[in-house]
Amino acid sequence: AAAQDAPTLNTPGWLYRSWLAAYGEETTRAISLAHGERAALDLTVASDPVGWSAKLDARLLPTGGLRRVTSGPITALPGYDAGAWWVQDAAASLPARLLGDVAGKSVIDMCAAPGGKAAQLAAAGATITAVDLSERRMERLVSNMGRLGFTMEAVHGDAASWRPAELVDAVLLDAP
């Protein structure tokens, strides 16, 4: 009976049957229904999360970030062009927060692209060196940081072998 619902739930029959065998009917239906829900958009703001929460019709998260459940192009949202916020999953914002107060400190962000954590650190007053192996992703990081109005040193390099010229206060590595 549940397998007959698979097309209605926008889940391919073969996938639904696989889940059904692995998880049972109740969990399979829950997974299928969850896949049909609109994904939330998490944002990190440079400042004034309460104010931006109202402007963006977003919920303020315990991490200090925002979550929107409405859709539309992000470039059309208030504050995008001004660099007031950037897209960053709430969980992805946690590693930078764990460094504590980084104001005035030098921080290397390894595997840095697309730049959400580097932006967090820059917004908190750190001097950033962003290192990433992918030239294409590094170009995106530089573009993102430019839109946000943050400066940093961009290094195209391998986190496994690159070494800084000088000691720094902290290194952030949230490797893929």
Q: Model segments located where?
A:
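S-adenosylmethionine
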Residues: A1-P176
